[in-house]
A protein has these predicted regions:
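Short, intrinsically disordered low-complexity segments
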Residues: 39, 60, 756-787
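Short beta-strand elements
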Residues: 594, 747-766, 807-815
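Generic structural signal for residues in well-ordered beta-strands
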Residues: 178, 257, 357, 475, ...
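Extracytoplasmic/periplasmic
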Residues: 731-746
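Inter-lobe coupling/hinge segments of SF2-like helicase ATPases
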Residues: 272-282, 286-293, 299-734, 767, ...
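Short helix-capping segments at alpha-helix termini
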Residues: 353, 588, 747-753, 803-804
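Residues at beta-strand starts and edge strands
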Residues: 5, 20, 38, 330, ...
Length: 819
């Protein structure tokens, strides 16, 4: 059989159930440009609808009847190299996504194409009308197309004609009255400005303009200006010389000057950053730095946990490591979990590395992200700093990845592909023979376990950099506050400490943990929280049916009004930041208060924090955004308004997250020369997690938590795969979820899976059962994250999609989901 030059293409229109590299012929005219890593337009499906794709490889294959050919090359050069293609293929196998979904995650949004379906007249209007006789609705379409100049976007046609547009369009296309083409347009275009320079040497330019200096002064001024300034933007030449654009064009025709285009990069502006002082490490920091640097120099894959108490100076160690990595001729990547932390960290790194640092995160304008990506790709950047998406920056010769606050759930993506940045970072370090550093005061239990098992190395920072003591912590019992007649949100101990700070001119941060607040029941007298008898997680309250439910195994029971332990009244816990702010203003009417949460800070995180620091505003109130990474020397008091809210949610990470949050927020106090204090308000002051956090005792917390994880088969002792079914009809979704559970149980009996002792739980409603009018039920597979399990779950997704009984429903899989 005849073979042909073909390409393997990842097609954007292919859903996960049929995703694979598709083979396409390469027309002779496109052979030179059809290389791996460029995007193409290809016909796909029975209707040969044009779809975007990315070439994965060039191959020689048999030319089969009906083979399709690529129609258009979209990129002048590859947007992904072989390493990027390999990463996309790895993500497909790991995170149950299509190859093209992985590609879109790797590339900056500015490089994405928007596809437009354009319908055009294929003949003269009068001929079209006579040919279209007998086609219902044809004349309305033709009228609209004529008004639009003979062609129109499908969206314009649908807006004007509604659902009635589809049938006449198809009929007229079949009758060759209309043509339909797909137009691909980049979301963001490159920006450039016009430059001007002398086209002849200076002496000749003066010789040609000097004689006519009086009659054509502008031409002489242009030559005089360019002779001094050299190549300059045309707008500046006109501004400084008064020459019009017409004058410049005339000079170009005369051969005096030449125009050219120069790329203009849209880079986020930073105010002038002073060069940073020499970094002086203390003995502990120096020891940690030298240990990790040895692994960078060894050029072998390694993972090190830099475990340091809050305020121990981990950032200074990061800076020194990056300095030495760059000295070795390698590049570095520094990740932070929250956008709010990026500007503060960027200023620190810019003070040492200047313009060789690029910042990447989702709050940047799309144009800025795209231009930063271009700088990185061209090798103009040695250090990339940003949130989890910065991992995909095309840095060459990578030597070091640092993940600050590695315990944060925001390192796990909630959108397809649902990747874990920690896993992707490890993949990159293995590929590049680079060192990975996880920095944290409260590492995840899985990371600490990997250290204990010898899989990771560990470097310790036990003391604060300035030798200050850790904050003194007071636990305020909210049950006692109620008994004392104070039902408010600010306890007496916290109010008294705030009064002291206001009198001393010192600042305070108040933290409100709102996660899960409206769905928790708690006894206001003894602190009892209903827990699932099987899973040891707090149950979620559903107001629609008045029941408590576990979202792992599906256990359900009626919600009681009174406490089964002491007979006290059960109460719903939680209040928003606005209500807290109102109470603070009543208590302290003269005090300045700043509020920072998701509702009030769209694009303004940095401005609020700068105001808090510059104007020394007495009180900053906020949610998760104020809990970590902030460093203000005049903050001496931190208040945690309700420690229980994150502790009693139905997630196996609840204790870990609460300990981490409390430790982090308490660590914001006393980072200057003054001793810090903290007040933790809670209904359960005897809880081990809260007591360990108050003492900043990670080791005690870890020992308790690892015992519970082993007992319940939670990570790191097993992996949890959440298999979620969603759809618009709740009954159908629940029946499909039950069917998925039974299929999973049958599949888990296979020998290659049974060895991991898998267990299938559920189905149970998702924590938020209805989103965008779609109901969600899920099963949980407790097992082993190995190749056999992932292949089985991939098969399950594909089989579910192919079953006509599941039409209109979706199934997706999460691994050790953050929520």
């Amino acid at each position: 059989m005849e073979t042909a030059d073909m390409v393997k293409v990842a097609v954007s229109a292919a859903p996960y159930s049929i995703d694979k590299p598709y083979s396409y012929l390469v027309p002779d005219a496109l052979v030179a440009a059809a290389v791996p890593g460029v995007r193409v337009m290809v016909p796909f499906g029975r209707g040969n609808k044009e779809s975007e794709g990315l070439i994965l490889a060039r191959v020689q294959e048999p030319k089969l009847p009906g083979s399709k050919a690529i129609r258009q090359i979209l990129d002048p050069e590859p947007v992904l190299d072989k390493a990027g293609i390999d990463l996309a293929l790895w993500m497909r196998g790991r995170y149950f996504c299509t190859v093209f979904e992985a590609v879109k995650t790797i590339l900056p949004a500015g490089l994405w194409y928007g596809l437009r379906e354009i319908w055009s007249l294929a003949m003269e209007p009068e001929t079209a009308r006579s040919t279209a006789v007998g086609i219902p609705g044809a004349w309305q379409v033709l009228d609209l197309l004529e008004k639009q100049g003979g062609k129109a976007d499908i969206r314009v046609l649908r807006d004007a004609l509604g659902d009635g547009a589809e049938k006449p369009l198809k009929a007229m296309k079949k009758a060759e009255i209309l043509t339909c083409e797909t137009d691909a347009k980049r979301k963001i275009a490159d920006k450039s400005h016009r430059m001007v320079e002398l086209a002849v040497n200076t002496e000749d330019a003066y010789a040609l303009t000097e004689p006519k200096r009086r009659s054509a002064p502008a031409r002489y001024e242009v030559v005089n200006f360019l002779a001094t300034a050299g190549r300059t933007p045309a707008a500046e030449v006109s501004y400084y010389t008064g020459a019009s654009s017409r004058t410049l064009k005339t000079m170009e025709k005369a051969g005096l000057i030449a125009f050219s285009e120069e790329e203009e990069l849209r880079v986020p502006s930073l105010d002038d950053v002073e060069p940073g002082p020499e970094i002086v490490l203390n003995e502990e920091q120096q020891r940690a730095f030298e240990e990790i640097l040895g692994r960078v120099q060894a050029a072998k894959p390694s993972v090190t946990l830099l475990h340091g108490v809050t305020g121990s100076g981990k950032t200074q160690v990061y800076l020194r490591l990056v300095q030495e990595t760059l000295a070795l001729g390698k590049t570095a990547m520094v990740l932070v979990p929250e956008i709010v932390l990026t500007p503060q960290m960027m200023r620190k790194f810019s003070s040492y590395f200047g313009s060789r640092v690029a910042m990447l995160h989702s709050s940047l304008k799309m144009t800025e992200r795209y231009d930063q990506w271009k700088r990185i790709r061209r090798g103009e950047v040695d250090v990339v700093l940003g949130t989890r998406s910065a991992l995909f920056a095309p840095l060459k010769n990578l030597g070091l990845i640092i993940m600050d606050e590695e315990q944060e759930g925001s390192y796990q993506s909630e959108n397809v592909p649902r990747y874990d940045a920690r896993e992707v970072a490890k993949y990159l370090c293995v590929r590049e023979k680079a060192a990975l550093v996880f920095g944290s005061a409260t590492p995840t239990v899985e990371t600490a376990w990997a250290v204990e098992q010898g899989s990771y190395q560990k470097a310790l920072l036990r003391r604060r950099y300035n030798e200050n003591a850790l904050p003194e912590v007071l636990i305020a019992d909210l049950r006692q506050e109620i008994l004392n007649g104070n039902p408010g949100l600010i306890s007496t101990p916290l109010r008294q400490e705030l009064e002291k700070n206001l009198a001393a001119g010192e600042q305070s941060i108040l933290f409100l943990n709102r996660r899960g607040s409206s769905r928790m029941l708690l006894c206001g007298e003894c602190g009892y929280v209903p827990q699932c008898p099987r899973c040891s997680t707090a149950m979620t309250y559903h107001s629609a049916n008045g029941r408590l439910m576990c979202h792992y195994c599906g256990h359900s029971e009626p919600a009681a009004d009174t406490c089964p332990e002491c007979g006290g009244w059960m109460k719903h816990v939680g209040a928003g930041t606005q209500k807290v702010e109102e109470e603070l203003r009543e208590l302290f009417p003269e005090a300045g208060i700043l509020r920072m949460d998701a509702d009030t800070t769209a694009g303004g995180h940095e401005e609020i924090l700068q105001t808090f620091e510059r104007e020394r505003v007495p009180i900053l109130l906020g949610t998760q955004m104020v809990a970590k990474g902030l460093d203000f020397e005049n903050v001496t008091l931190v208040g945690v308004l309700s420690a229980d809210i994150s502790l009693y949610v139905d997630n196996y990470r609840a204790a870990e997250r609460t300990f981490s949050l409390l430790t982090q927020v308490v660590g914001r106090a006393g980072r200057g020369g003054k001793t810090g204090r903290a007040v933790i308000q809670t209904y359960t002051p005897g809880n081990d997690v809260i007591r360990c956090a108050a003492r900043q005792d990670y080791d005690a917390f870890y020992e308790s938590e690892i015992r519970m994880r082993r007992l319940r088969r939670y990570p790191p002792f097993a992996d949890l795969f959440t298999v979620t079914v969603s759809g618009t009809e709740e009954g159908r979704v629940l029946r499909a979820a039950v069917s998925v559970r039974e299929t999973l149980r049958q599949l888990c009996r296979r020998p290659e899976l049974a060895a991991g002792e898998p267990e299938v739980l559920g189905p149970a409603p998702a924590p938020v059962v209805k989103v965008n009018n779609r109901f969600r039920y899920r099963c949980t597979l407790v097992g082993k994250n190995d190749k056999a399990t992932r292949e089985m779950l991939a098969w399950l997704q594909k089989d579910f999609a192919k079953d006509s009984a599941n039409r209109g429903m979706n199934l997706f899989v999460d691994h050790n989901a953050a929520d």
